Every structure is written in structure tokens, then in C-alpha cells.
């Protein structure tokens, strides 16, 4: 299917989530979807773990300190088959907009770092999970499986893909997306401290600037613009922000309160050739970053270097992707033979259709 729309407006969220509060998180999600819809956007991109906020506290606490926060975080994470998710899908439908949404997904007793791409009809086009939680994130989240790996979907606005955080740095994930002909990418980022917090021997890769743009007087080798250049995609980089109240909610008793500004101002949008297309947001900016996308502007970049096509040698180098779900327990398919298989999307209820639109679909 060729894109129906080659030129359209898109938005990346640069805002504070509803920390530890599922209902507030959903309200803010619908608010920004409505805002993007009012501004005639066809795509809105949310940060990693937007619902119920990225648990940055796990980088700063010991085991005992983590327990109350972990319990509250689990209680306010999102079931995919839930009234809350249906309200978000209805908002996408009411605004006729594609939504890339990052959330902490509850699946039985486990949590996953999940993204879904919602269509303007409110259907789930893609459901993926971060393939490997980063470092201390494994305190909270499990890993994705084979059928939650693919990140790119053909849509009416082009081949749209999304990845979480350091997946955008993973050369194998980039190669996979490039092989699928990705045109528009959502590099979803969490809450991240700035370089002023860096202490030896912590690597520079673990601060925000290393992931949002290049340093002055240094090579443009950093994560998000590099993704745009290497894949030849429009790359939207939504980021979370935090206020003083958010700092209090994420800080255990007895710990010093940080300056929220060290975390803010990192939202970006890059052209297929790596140019930054939007002014850097102010530290106190809460809102949407907008970009006008023209899919025809991708052609010349990819004509020089299409690593999913003419500029690759699959006879020499190939990537093996196993897209099958791996279940702990499998059962026999007595009708068709072999093993009975249920996709993760089916199992968590994301293939269920929405009910007919209601008059209150757009209410925040």
C-alpha cells in the first residue's frame, strides 16, 4: 500500500506525565491527542513509559527504598484490555490521528515497556515490547518476545515505526527497521538527567545530551540524529519532563530533592539527513513540538544510502529475526496439528474492536 498522504503535520510530546496516577495519565494522554487533533496533526508521538511515567527513581534507590514505589507503580500501570486503553483509542478515533503510545503494560503478574501504534479508526496496528530492559530497569520490567519485536507498520501516512530509549542506539534494531523501509520514526525517550549530573566513571552515553543531539564542536555521532541519518527517516523524539511536584513524588523520604531543570528541554525532531527541525524547547516548556513531514524529501537521502536496500549486501551480511512468541507452556493443536499458537496481541486483548463512537469520545 502506497501512502495516501505524503505531506502532513506531526507532533512530539515534550511534557510531564501523570506520575503514579493511571487516571491522571490517561487524562493527559487524551488532552495531548486532542491538542494535536485541533492542530490538524496526523500523528502524535508519546515518550517511553508515558503511562504512568518513567520510573527514574529506580536509578537512585536501594532495594528497600524501591519497594513502596514499585508497588504504587505496578498499581497504576495499564492493562491493554481495559477501559482506560479504550478511552485512549476512542480519542485517536475522534481526532482521526495515528498515536504512538508508550506505557507500562500489565500482563498477568509482569510489567513490560510497551508501545502501540493506534490508527485513526482506533485500531491497534502494532504492539511491541522493549526487547531488553536497560540495567536497573530489570527491577521493574520483563523482556519482549518474538512477536512483539517488529516496529514498522505500513500506514496511510507512510511506513511508521517506533522504538524505546536505547533501542534507538541498537544497530540490529536499526537494521531491522531499515529493512522494513521505515519512513517516519518515533524515538521514544523517558525522563533523563542532563550532562551536569555526570559523575565519573558513569559513561557519557547515560546523560540526555548523548541521546538527543550532537555536542558543539564534536562529530554528530549521537543517538537520535544518528538514527535519522542511518535510516533516512523523519525522526520524532518525544521526551518526558518533570516539575518540582513530580520530583517530590519520585523521591523516597530522606533523599535530597533535585532541581527539575536538569531533566527538561530535550524534545527533538530530525530530518532524514539529521538536521534538527525544531527549536530546542525551554526547560519549563510543556507541550507539543510540531513538524511538517513531506515523504518525498526522504528520496534523495535514501538514494545515497539506503541500508535496507541498494546500499546493503545481504549476500554478505544478513540479520536473522525470530518473530515467534516463546511461551512458558505450550499445548497441542489437536485440529490442525503442531503447537497451538496465540499472538501476544490477541492474548492481551488488543485485537478487540472498539464499540461505535459515543458523543463523549473527545472529553478530557
UniProtKB/Swiss-Prot annotation:
Optimum pH is 5-6.5. Active fom pH 5 to pH 9. Disulfide bonds: none annotated. Gene3D superfamilies: Carbon-nitrogen hydrolase. Oligomer of dimers, forming left-handed helical fibers. Residues 8-295 form the CN hydrolase domain. This is Cyanide hydratase. The active site is at 48 (proton acceptor), 130, 165 (nucleophile). Belongs to the carbon-nitrogen hydrolase superfamily. Nitrilase family. GO terms for biological process: cyanide catabolic process. It is an enzyme of class 4 (lyase). The keyword Cytoplasm does not apply. It comes from Emericella nidulans (strain FGSC A4 / ATCC 38163 / CBS 112.46 / NRRL 194 / M139). One of its GO terms (molecular function) is nitrilase activity. Keywords: Hydrolase, Lyase.
Amino acid at each position: 500500500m502506497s501512502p495516501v498522504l505524503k505531506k502532513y503535520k506531526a507532533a512530539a510530546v515534550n511534557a510531564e506525565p501523570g506520575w503514579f496516577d493511571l487516571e491522571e495519565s490517561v487524562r493527559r494522554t487524551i488532552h495531548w491527542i486532542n491538542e494535536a487533533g485541533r492542530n490538524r496533526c496526523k500523528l502524535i508521538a508519546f515518550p517511553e513509559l508515558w503511562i504512568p511515567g518513567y520510573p527514574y527513581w529506580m536509578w537512585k534507590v536501594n532495594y528497600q527504598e524501591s519497594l513502596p514505589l514499585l508497588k504504587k507503580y505496578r498499581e497504576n500501570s495499564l492493562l491493554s484490555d481495559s477501559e482506560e486503553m479504550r478511552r485512549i483509542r476512542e480519542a485517536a478515533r475522534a481526532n482521526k490521528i495515528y498515536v504512538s503510545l508508550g506505557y507500562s503494560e500489565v500482563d498477568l503478574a509482569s510489567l513490560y515497556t510497551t508501545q502501540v501504534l493506534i490508527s485513526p479508526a482506533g485500531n491497534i496496528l502494532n504492539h511491541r515490547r522493549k526487547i531488553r530492559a536497560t540495567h536497573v530497569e530489570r527491577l521493574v520490567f520483563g523482556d519482549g518476545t518474538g512477536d512483539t519485536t517488529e516496529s514498522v507498520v505500513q500506514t496511510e501516512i507512510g511506513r511508521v515505526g517506533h522504538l524505546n530509549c536505547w533501542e534507538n542506539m541498537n544497530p540490529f534494531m536499526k537494521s531491522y527497521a531499515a529493512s522494513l523501509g521505515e519512513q517516519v520514526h518515533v524515538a521514544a525517550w523517558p525522563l533523563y538527567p542532563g550532562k551536569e549530573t555526570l559523575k565519573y566513571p558513569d559513561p557519557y552515553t547515560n546523560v540526555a545530551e548523548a541521546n538527543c543531539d550532537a555536542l558543539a564542536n564534536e562529530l554528530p555521532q549521537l543517538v537520535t540524529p544518528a538514527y535519522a541519518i542511518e535510516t533516512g527517516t523523519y525522526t520524532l523524539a518525544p521526551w518526558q519532563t518533570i516539575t518540582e511536584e513530580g520530583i517530590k513524588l519520585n523521591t523516597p523520604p530522606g533523599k535530597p530533592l533535585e532541581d527539575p531543570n536538569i531533566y527538561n528541554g530535550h524534545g527533538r525532531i530530525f530530518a532524514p539527513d539529521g538536521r534538527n527541525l525544531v527549536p530546542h524547547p525551554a526547560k519549563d516548556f510543556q507541550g507539543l513540538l510540531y513538524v511538517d513531514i513531506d515523504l518525498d524529501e526522504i528520496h534523495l537521502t535514501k538514494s545515497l544510502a539506503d541500508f535496507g536496500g541498494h546500499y546493503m549486501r545481504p549476500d554478505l551480511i544478513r540479520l536473522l529475526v525470530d518473530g515467534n512468541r516463546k511461551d512458558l507452556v505450550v499445548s497441542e493443536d489437536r485440529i490442525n496439528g503442531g503447537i497451538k499458537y496465540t499472538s501476544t496481541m490477541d492474548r492481551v486483548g488488543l485485537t478487540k474492536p472498539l464499540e461505535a463512537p459515543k458523543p463523549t469520545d473527545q472529553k478530557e
